Amino acid sequence: MRRERDATQIPENPMEGIPQTAAAAAAAAAAEASEPPRKRARVDGGGGGAGEEEEDRLSDLPDCLLEDILAHLGSRQAVQTSVLSRRWRNLWRGVRVVVIDVGSFRLPGADGDPPRFRLDRIEDFADGVLSPSLHPGAARELDALRMRLDEDAVTTNFQRWIRRALWRRPATVDLYYLPRRSFSWPPAVPLTPVTAVSRLKTLRIFGLRPTVVFGADEFPALEDLHIERCSYAHGTIASPTLKRLALVSPINGCFVREQRLTAPGLTSLRLVLPYSREEGVRVITDAPLTSLVDASITIVDTDPGDPRNRRVNQFKVDFLVAISNLLGRLTSVRNLDLTGLNATALLDNKSQEFPMFPYLTTLLLNECDIGYKYHVLRSILQNAPNLEQLRLHNCKFVGKSRRKAGQTQSKEKTSKCSSSTLSSACSSLKSVEIKHPRGEPSHDLLHEFLKEIPHNQWRKRSIDEETISIELNRK
């Protein structure tokens, strides 16, 4: 009997894109599912030759279980199984995960050639999976929407696919857009109305331009927010439900200079912030983040390594001071990773001391400036009384000890920093890991550090060959 093509625009070759082994297995499974339960021989493990028989109950599996299996295949392969048998014909419609990955429609080409895609197939497939003929209330709610788009593969208004998916009230949305041109401006992405995102708990956006404010009224259930290489013009993230936030490489630092954060329930924060003499996004929070447990801050100076760029620049100074102020709001953290921070960013602008971190147990300083005769490191150890693990990766101590113009360092502070050894500054310290490339000037840090540590209290654990990596553990 000739089968009619489904209205969901199944490709002419429905098995295209499925590996032969997977296709064969799926076909066999579907064939068994479409037949009545039957007996099949099972070879006895003892090799006695007398096979036992068991029933094949694949066809008895409930739809919900098969739909969960299809959810792990991705939408394209899930749709392709619909032509295998009647048992599988409409199962994909009930799958609560929609995955649209244009990479599976890429045409073969030589290495190094620009990617080419089957644009018509992409549009037909996406329009079929997210059919406009389905009334918003008729389709099942989604557990997740995942879209991986490419600038060269999307010539149509892909926002309509997002809009249709949002009407199914997904709990997780993952949108990835890969630009191919250097000066491409991120396309806008709609995330409205509120009723469509009322269940949304996890939102990850890459390379797009969200047009809505991330606030409590707009996203009443949002807990996990990841924004990477996006242009976000509103400059405010305010959510009492937010628990995890990642703001990675925002690309609008030339006209949006501040990102205000209000999230009293935040437990995890990750920031990757490029900055230069002309642009950079400063993250500001008015109140301490008292629920924070894990924090990671990376700052990247994007100015060329030209001697002229080493001169004092007020915009850079303001950016680094903002990082220092932010650190002072994160004092409840237990695990802290810092990359690229210099003394201006690490020390408080007024007291010239590291903020007090009473609960900090694990600290990573990566490519940080720990000060003249590591006075910054001393301040860190003195103000982190419960620190247990310290990792110093590719750190350096350059420049002179910081002090305000026209002021001298107080005798109390001088005595405090110079009289204590690194070991006594933090008595709770249990392990120290120092890494840097062999032959780099930062080996002085290792020698100076070892000189101040009582050898009868610490022992070396490992030394790497390519990089000098020494782990010290308290006995």
UniProtKB/Swiss-Prot annotation:
Pathway in which this enzyme or protein is active: Protein modification; protein ubiquitination
UniProt GO BP: DNA repair; meiotic cell cycle; protein ubiquitination
Cellular localization per UniProt: Nucleus; Chromosome
Source lineage: Eukaryota, Viridiplantae, Streptophyta, Embryophyta, Tracheophyta
Family matches, as Pfam families: F-box (PF00646)
Subunit and partners: Part of a SCF (SKP1-CUL1-F-box protein) E3 ubiquitin-protein ligase complex. Interacts (via F-box domain) directly with SKP1.
Origin species: Oryza sativa subsp. japonica
Stretches with biased composition (Low complexity): 22-33
Expression by tissue: Highly expressed in the stem, leaf and in the anther during meiosis. Weakly expressed in roots and lemma/palea.
GO CC annotation, single: chromosome
Full protein name: MEIOTIC F-BOX protein MOF
Domain spans labelled F-box: 55-91
Protein family according to the UniProt entry: Belongs to the F-box protein family. FBX subfamily.
Function: Probable component of a SCF (SKP1-CULLIN-F-box protein) E3 ubiquitin-protein ligase complex and may function through the ubiquitin-mediated protein degradation or signaling pathway. Required for male meiotic prophase I progression. Required for telomere bouquet formation, homologous chromosome pairing and for the formation of the synaptonemal complex (SC), which stabilizes initial chromosomal axial associations and promotes crossover formation.
Region entry Disordered, spans: 1-58
Gene name as annotated: MOF
UniProt keyword list: Chromosome, DNA damage, DNA repair, Meiosis, Nucleus, Ubl conjugation pathway
Tagged with keyword Nucleus: yes
CDD domains, per database record: F-box_AtFBL13-like
Phenotype of null mutants: Plants are female fertile, but male sterile as they are not able to produce tetrads and microspores. No differences compared to the wild-type plant during the vegetative stage. Plants develop normal panicles and floral organs, except for smaller and pale-yellow anthers that fail to produce viable pollen grains. No effect on the differentiation or early mitotic division of germ cells. No meiocytes are detected in 4.5 mm and 5.0 mm long flowers, but in 3.0 mm flowers meiosis appears to initiate normally.
Gene3D superfamilies: Ribonuclease Inhibitor
InterPro entries assigned: F-box-like_dom_sf, F-box_AtFBL13-like, F-box_dom, F-box_SCFL_complex_component, LRR_dom_sf
Principal subcellular localization: nucleus
PANTHER family, sorted: MEIOTIC F-BOX PROTEIN MOF, OS11G0201299 PROTEIN
